[in-house]
Amino acid sequence: MIVTTTDVIQGAVIDSYLGIVTAEVVYGSNFLRDFLAGIRDVIGGRTGSYERLFEQGQRKAIEELELRAQRLGANAVIGIEIDTGTINVDQSGVLLLITATGTAVRVR
């Protein structure tokens, strides 16, 4: 499966556009990680645990995007965009949302 952020694949011809595919990954907050990240925010520095979480989430979202594209008969996904956001859940915390979107295509 070819996955790319571009709208074309060099050397390939798009035979058919199969539709938009979207995949979401949601992570719940973790009290200890959030507490330690808050301390780092105050004293400065990077929060490695959140960086790793974002990296993992992006990989998972792209993997799910590939699976959904394969179900449509695609062998490539073009124009991939990854968005991140948070969802506030009352007083209990925040959910991290990572969304990947692209166009499933059949190429030769």
UniProtKB/Swiss-Prot annotation:
One of the Pfam families matching this protein, by short name: YbjQ_1
Alphabetical list of Gene3D superfamilies matching this protein: Hypothetical protein apc22750. Chain B
Cross-referenced InterPro entries: UPF0145_dom_sf, UPF0145_YbjQ-like
Family in the record: Belongs to the UPF0145 family.
PANTHER family: UPF0145 PROTEIN YBJQ
Alphabetized HAMAP family for the sequence: UPF0145 (MF_00338)
Protein name in the entry: UPF0145 protein Ava_0420
